[in-house]
Amino acid sequence: MLPFTREMHRFSPIVEFLLSKRQIFLHYSQFKSRFDLIHRSFHVSRALEDNFRRSNGIGLVCLEKSHNDRTKNSKYDEFASDVEKSYRILRKFHSRVPKLELALNESGVELRPGLIERVLNRCGDAGNLGYRFFVWAAKQPRYCHSIEVYKSMVKILSKMRQFGAVWGLIEEMRKENPQLIEPELFVVLVQRFASADMVKKAIEVLDEMPKFGFEPDEYVFGCLLDALCKHGSVKDAAKLFEDMRMRFPVNLRYFTSLLYGWCRVGKMMEAKYVLVQMNEAGFEPDIVDYTNLLSGYANAGKMADAYDLLRDMRRRGFEPNANCYTVLIQALCKVDRMEEAMKVFVEMERYECEADVVTYTALVSGFCKWGKIDKCYIVLDDMIKKGLMPSELTYMHIMVAHEKKESFEECLELMEKMRQIEYHPDIGIYNVVIRLACKLGEVKEAVRLWNEMEENGLSPGVDTFVIMINGLASQGCLLEASDHFKEMVTRGLFSVSQYGTLKLLLNTVLKDKKLEMAKDVWSCITSKGACELNVLSWTIWIHALFSKGYEKEACSYCIEMIEMDFMPQPDTFAKLMKGLKKLYNREFAGEITEKVRNMAAEREMSFKMYKRRGVQDLTEKAKSKQDREGKKKQRSR
């Protein structure tokens, strides 16, 4: 165990206050919260990645000074008007390209360095809006895309998983602007493939580079290893490392990436083997490697090994830095060992190692998880007094803790405190507060916050739309919920992952006997071409209609579905046949049966087996529903 000091006068006021109040160390099991989800990262939550830079190109993160774009960026006022003007035009006309281009041509927007990136960023998750603007800008006289614009577009298309379009874009660059192609462009692509868990495609980038005039070098290969390790594909990275040792001479960076990858997934034996390989290759571990090992031990619950390693570092001449202590504090906070986390914080100050934003954020998260929000504010005030600007994640921990306690006014007060130190709430903060407002029935406040968010130049993403739609629907504001859903579709944000929201909205609207409104929502999806409709989407729509008593409409849409070459799921067919039998509607039943029989024959399926499977599925679902209702009644007694 570390030799923790008892002398309190040497430490910060926050340490003195917290450690002098023994009553704050309550039994950890009394408190459960969602913050376990936030601590999955070894060094910091992914929510902080945008605010940190990579050290030596590996997985460890280091804090950069925070600068609020609106107050520190001298170009903000210069760009703001044109960015908003372009964004509003894109929202209004993006599905009608001729009108869109005409509106942009007549907008008076002057293309200049930096503006395109700002507009692309303003489009947020609506990548198709950004792509429309990118295409229009390329057609303008006396303008040529810069490498930064191309890189931004590659990131946007990759985030949408439009990798074919990405390669097409790079091919276009090769033909029209070959001088702009640089290795960093392929690094961006490698990172996106890795984040999408497309390991083979990420590796294939190395083979594609020569076609564009570049041979992969040690830097690009190192970025590939780093990306694979960062996103959990460390086994593939280790195999690739062995396969490529003759092609790319080993260096410390490669070993550090592998070490981070194994520690990240808790494979400490493999991590130790990397140390052996490192030593055999003539490299000594540095402070970053030691920090990765500390993180691995701590997150595996092996705190004794972590403390031993900390002492060993000092013996070897490596004085632990803020990152070293922070990974220990994060791991302790994660398992509710807050008293021990505070002792590590004390030890940190005893060795005159200054805590950074990540350290303070770890303490904030722990106290929030522990249910002591008042202590979070003490930590927050202390870090601000020391000149440290809290990060988005720092505020997010406190905001979510308030949400859990349904303290809406406290959320608004915290947002105001953020503004007072010139720190404007981001999308994540707005998501939490809007969700709580809807939950508490404060619909007007939710709408006000939404409008405020857009006025501040923030683009609602998929999560924000889903929160708003679900919240409005739960409060009976069905027209507003439907309007927001259609707006989400219009902005190109609707995809298969939002089918749950579609199902909830359709069922809620139909339950309220608003058939035309439900049809309008469905029509919006089909007419806008927002998402390639599949069997699941049709099933959601048909089941919603049928379950709410609209049998005729359900059958009509089923026939339309079949005509689009989608075969109904067996239980859908069985449900329709059962309903039509009760209604004595033999005409509809015969038409649907004949069409499905033909589809089964085309697919070389047994129609009898198909029918039997449908009846079985329907029976099992009915039984499952009865069991749930029975258990619910028992609990209510």
From Swiss-Prot:
Task: State whether keyword Repeat applies.
Answer: yes
Record keywords, A-Z: Repeat
* Keyword flag tRNA processing: no
Residues of the region (Disordered) are: 616-637
Renumbered to this chain, the Basic and acidic residues biased-composition regions fall at 616-630
A Pfam family in this protein?
PPR_1
Q: Where are the PPR repeats?
A: 146-180, 182-216, 217-247, 251-285, 286-320, 321-355, 356-390, 391-425, 426-460, 461-495, 498-532, 534-568
Question: Known InterPro entries for this protein?
Answer: Pentatricopeptide_rpt, TPR-like_helical_dom_sf
Q: Which family does it belong to?
A: Belongs to the PPR family. P subfamily.
**Could you tell me what this protein is called?**
Putative pentatricopeptide repeat-containing protein At5g65820
| Organism this protein belongs to | Arabidopsis thaliana (Mouse-ear cress)
**Lineage of this protein's species?**
Eukaryota, Viridiplantae, Streptophyta, Embryophyta, Tracheophyta
